[in-house]
């Protein structure tokens, strides 16, 4: 009977001629197919390719008539079998195990792929598929997606499959233990007594290496750790020198609990600190308040305020010290006046460079009596000619950079005679070596501007400008210089008027 055929019915040459669920009845479509194929012409069967895996799954499920598929036959394998492989299941086996007729149409969102020839041979070696199935188009599904599907929609099937997995894991551990015990029984050869000390040394050496590596890893990589219970990052405590017990022993009266109670601890004052205390008469005035750093952009008003504050503090300190000394009927010693004047001078010196430091650095760039560099065989970097002739064919002396070997004619550099005379009074720099006079840095060339009188370079942010000004700009160094008339005629006119 067809009902008793079992799984062997799936291998019959005509598996789709009869329905195993209704062995005694046939559909009109089957009658028509029998009438058309009554021996005159054999029926044509299309060979299924790799794209017809879902149809083969549907056909096999129909042929089996939702017969029971044991969970032991649902195989999970790894492909590729190396470390980079992932775990997969065959869609045909999953559909038979879950009893789904059209698995691909019911779950189209699952990631699936066709098996390659090498993968089929690998499964054939593992006895997962038969030789007949190697010629069919098989589809692989990701095992994690299949497990999630079974948990959500087929909990009973998943529980049955979990039991099988646990039994397989238990059997694997048992087999591994048996192999290990057999290896121990085979390797029961006795160790020579003379080699035992050598083996002990090797074992101790290996243990020492492991301990050293572990300690080094703890010190370098795992010094701090995050405590999950307190949400605190634990960091090892630093190393401290421990004093001997005699030095840290607590006395009988360490500290006074109420005012006037005896205690053995007392503060030790230095001689300089005692001079400020009014034991009989204070030798020193109260110490001055610490100065706060003033911003450079405050201007001259801060200088005036600082000067007035210093004057007030000075007068106040003098009056305090004089009043205290007069009340006791003593004259201030010479050492007090000297120390007071010394502190006041040091304070003034400390306050002065804070305000005038940049200005002094600018003025220090112009060296009195400076002699420019002399290069005998110098060549202009623009016209490539010497001092004998410039680009106009006239003899003209060259100016030289103080930092490098570059030289040039003033006419080639579009410099006036006044600018050339000013350049020769300080170490002039060419465009490639130009640095800011205030900060001394060559960076931020887009913010660098040059004085029209001396050709010194300045950063806009070093002189307090937001952008490079348009038109003529003169630096602070040239503004402080005495004005010199430029034209001979105007100088003569002024002399006549005078």
Curated annotation (Swiss-Prot):
| Amino acid composition bias (Low complexity), ranges on this chain | 1-10, 285-296
Presence of the UniProt keyword NAD in the record: no
Region (SAY) residue ranges read 89-295
The record's Gene Ontology cellular component field reads: chromatin; kinetochore; npBAF complex; nuclear matrix; nucleoplasm; nucleus; RSC-type complex; SWI/SNF complex
Sorted alphabetically, which InterPro entries does this protein's record hold?
PHF10_PHD_finger_1, Znf_FYVE_PHD, Znf_PHD, Znf_PHD-finger, Znf_RING/FYVE/PHD
Region named Essential to induce neural progenitor proliferation: 89-185, 292-334
Q: Which stretches are zinc fingers (PHD-type)?
A: 379-436, 438-481
UniProt GO BP: chromatin remodeling; nervous system development; positive regulation of cell differentiation; positive regulation of double-strand break repair; positive regulation of myoblast differentiation; positive regulation of stem cell population maintenance; positive regulation of T cell differentiation; regulation of G0 to G1 transition
GO MF entry, a single one: zinc ion binding
Q: Which CDD domains match?
A: PHD1_PHF10, PHD2_PHF10, WH_NTD_PHF10
Q: Which SMART domains match?
A: PHD (SM00249)
Q: Which residues are recorded with the post-translational modification Phosphoserine?
A: 12, 36, 50, 270, 297, 301, 327, 331
As stated in the Swiss-Prot or TrEMBL entry, residues carrying the post-translational modification N-acetylalanine are 2
Q: What are the UniProt keywords, alphabetically?
A: Acetylation, Isopeptide bond, Metal-binding, Neurogenesis, Nucleus, Phosphoprotein, Repeat, Transcription, Transcription regulation, Ubl conjugation, Zinc, Zinc-finger
> Which spans does this entry mark as compositional bias, Basic and acidic residues?
345-359
Task: For the region Disordered, give the residue spans.
Answer: 1-62, 285-368
Cite the location of the cross-link Glycyl lysine isopeptide (Lys-Gly) (interchain with G-Cter in SUMO2) from the record.
241, 385
- Compositional bias (Polar residues): 318-328
- SUPFAM superfamilies from the xrefs? FYVE/PHD zinc finger
Q: Where in the cell is it found?
A: Nucleus
As for what it does, the entry says:
Involved in transcription activity regulation by chromatin remodeling. Belongs to the neural progenitors-specific chromatin remodeling complex (npBAF complex) and is required for the proliferation of neural progenitors. During neural development a switch from a stem/progenitor to a post-mitotic chromatin remodeling mechanism occurs as neurons exit the cell cycle and become committed to their adult state. The transition from proliferating neural stem/progenitor cells to post-mitotic neurons requires a switch in subunit composition of the npBAF and nBAF complexes.
Family matches, as PANTHER family: HL01030P-RELATED, PHD FINGER PROTEIN 10
Sequence similarity: Belongs to the SAYP family.
* Quaternary structure annotation from Swiss-Prot or TrEMBL: Component of neural progenitors-specific chromatin remodeling complex (npBAF complex) composed of at least, ARID1A/BAF250A or ARID1B/BAF250B, SMARCD1/BAF60A, SMARCD3/BAF60C, SMARCA2/BRM/BAF190B, SMARCA4/BRG1/BAF190A, SMARCB1/BAF47, SMARCC1/BAF155, SMARCE1/BAF57, SMARCC2/BAF170, PHF10/BAF45A, ACTL6A/BAF53A and actin. Interacts with ACTL6A/BAF53A, SMARCA2/BRM/BAF190B, SMARCA4/BRG1/BAF190A and PBRM1/BAF180.
Descriptive protein name = PHD finger protein 10
What's the source species for this entry? Homo sapiens (Human)
């Amino acid at each position: 009977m067809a009902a008793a055929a079992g799984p062997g019915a799936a291998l019959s040459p005509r598996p789709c001629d009869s329905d195993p669920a209704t062995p005694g009845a046939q559909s009109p479509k089957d009658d028509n197919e029998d009438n058309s194929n009554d021996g005159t012409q054999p029926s044509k069967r299309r060979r299924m390719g790799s794209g017809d895996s879902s149809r083969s799954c549907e056909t096999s499920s129909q042929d089996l008539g939702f017969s029971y598929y044991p969970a032991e036959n649902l195989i999970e394998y790894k492909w590729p079998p190396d470390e980079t492989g992932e775990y997969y299941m065959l869609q045909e086996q999953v559909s038979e195990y879950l009893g789904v007729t059209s698995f691909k149409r019911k779950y189209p969102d699952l990631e699936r792929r066709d098996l390659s020839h090498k993968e089929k041979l690998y499964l054939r070696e593992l006895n997962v598929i038969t030789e007949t199935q190697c010629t069919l188009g098989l589809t692989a599904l990701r095992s994690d997606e299949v497990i999630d599907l079974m948990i959500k929609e087929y909990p009973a099937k998943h529980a049955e499959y979990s039991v099988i997995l646990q039994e397989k894991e238990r059997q694997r551990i048992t087999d591994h233990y048996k192999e290990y015990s057999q290896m121990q029984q085979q390797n029961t050869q006795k160790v020579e007594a003379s080699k035992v000390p050598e083996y002990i040394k090797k074992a101790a050496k290996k243990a020492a290496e492991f301990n050293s590596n572990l300690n080094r890893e703890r010190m370098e990589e795992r010094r701090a750790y995050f405590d999950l219970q307190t949400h605190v990052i634990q960091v090892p405590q630093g190393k401290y020198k421990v004093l001997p017990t005699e030095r840290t022993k607590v006395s009988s009266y360490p500290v006074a609990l109420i005012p006037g109670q005896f205690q053995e601890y007392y503060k030790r004052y230095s001689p300089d600190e005692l001079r400020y205390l009014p034991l009989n008469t204070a030798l020193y005035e109260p110490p001055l308040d610490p100065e706060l750093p003033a911003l450079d952009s405050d201007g001259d008003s801060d200088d005036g305020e600082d000067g007035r504050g210093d004057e007030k503090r000075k007068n106040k300190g003098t009056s305090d010290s004089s009043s205290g000394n007069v009340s006791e009927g003593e004259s201030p010693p010479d050492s007090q006046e000297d120390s007071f004047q010394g502190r006041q001078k040091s304070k003034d010196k400390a306050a002065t460079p804070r305000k005038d430091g940049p200005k002094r650095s600018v003025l220090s760039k112009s060296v009195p009596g400076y002699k420019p560099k002399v290069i005998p065989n110098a060549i202009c970097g623009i016209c490539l000619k010497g001092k004998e002739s410039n680009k106009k064919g006239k003899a003209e002396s060259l100016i030289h950079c103080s930092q490098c070997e570059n030289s040039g004619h003033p006419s080639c550099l579009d410099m006036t005679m006044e600018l050339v005379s000013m350049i020769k009074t300080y170490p002039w720099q060419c465009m490639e070596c130009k640095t800011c006079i205030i900060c001394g840095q060559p960076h931020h060339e887009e913010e660098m501007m040059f004085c029209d009188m001396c050709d010194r370079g300045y950063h806009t942010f070093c002189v307090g400008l937001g952008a490079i000004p348009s038109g003529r700009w003169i630096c602070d160094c040239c503004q402080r210089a005495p004005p010199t008339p430029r034209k001979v005629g105007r100088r003569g006119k002024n002399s006549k008027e005078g």
